Structures are given as structure tokens and as C-alpha cells.
């Protein structure tokens, strides 16, 4: 995926503000969406790139020198998130590694400010494979959001995937 496509998928979910924001990118990998997010945040913002693969994160370089990047090598599914209260959480092709999505989302909600949101980018599929062990289609995510207290979900983008299903982006907000 090109950086411009990643930016297009998430831009509607990032708050436009002049005030610095704090975000975490769970399952950051090599940083494509971390880089995309950095182009949308105001100066002085912080992004925590979180992934269990320290080597994958090794080459993450964000284009904006005015956004602070902090890399944390942990298993975001099982380890506690030790970040400051977040304005936003980005999960690009990461939620499909979580088997108990409801419990996980309830857990990460505790790291968010009350006005924060979760940006989710996933394959719109139900059938698992070795690379997508616990898939979550947008329809399933909609149903899951009903089980979260005071949550709303909105599909904000989609793009074709070279691996079968389309990729969607969704914004999960808490009222």
C-alpha cells in the first residue's frame, strides 16, 4: 500500500486541531500507518509506535520532525499499554490478531481520554487464514460496537486489497 492510500484511509478520523495530540499505533509493524498519521497531526504531537517486533519498527521514520515518535516493543494484545492518556488509537491490520475483541477494546478504552477515538483499518472478511487469524468484517465490527458501552462506529473509507477482500477504515467513538 502506498503512503497516500494510508493517509486517505485515516484522514477523516483524525481530529483537526492546532493543539498537540497523543496517539498510539498498535501493531505498528514497519510504520506505514504511523507515517500516515504523522502527516495529519499538528506540531508537538506524539505517536507511540507499538509492536512486538522491535526489528520491524527499527526503520520507522516519520516525515515530520515536529511530531515525536516513541517506539515501544511489547505484545499489545497481552502486555499492558503504558502510555499517557491518548487522544486516539490507531489499529491498522492489527485487530485481526486479537481473539477476544470485546475484552480487548474495553481494556484499551481505559487508556483513552473521554473524547478519544479508535481508528480501525481491517480486511472486510470473515474467513481466517494464517495471516489474518481472527478477521473482523465491518459488519461484525458494527455488531461488536453495540456491545461496547456508549460506543458508535462509522465507516470512513475503503480501498481494494491485492489479497482478496477490500480494506475498510472505521472510526470507533465513545459518547
Question: Which role fits each region the language model picked out?
Answer:
Residues 102-117:
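A short glycine-rich, Lys/Arg-flanked "PGG" loop and its adjoining helix->strand segment in the class I
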Residues 24, 29-79:
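Class I SAM-dependent methyltransferase SAM/SAH-binding core
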Residues 77-89:
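A short acidic, Gly/Pro-enriched loop at the edge of an enzyme's catalytic core
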Residues 1-21, 36:
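Conserved alpha-helix/loop element of class I SAM-dependent methyltransferases that forms part
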Residues 87-101:
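A short SAM/SAH-binding and catalytic strip from SAM-dependent methyltransferases
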Residues 4, 39, 117-171:
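C-terminal alpha-helical "lid/dimerization" subdomain adjacent to the S-adenosyl-L-methionine
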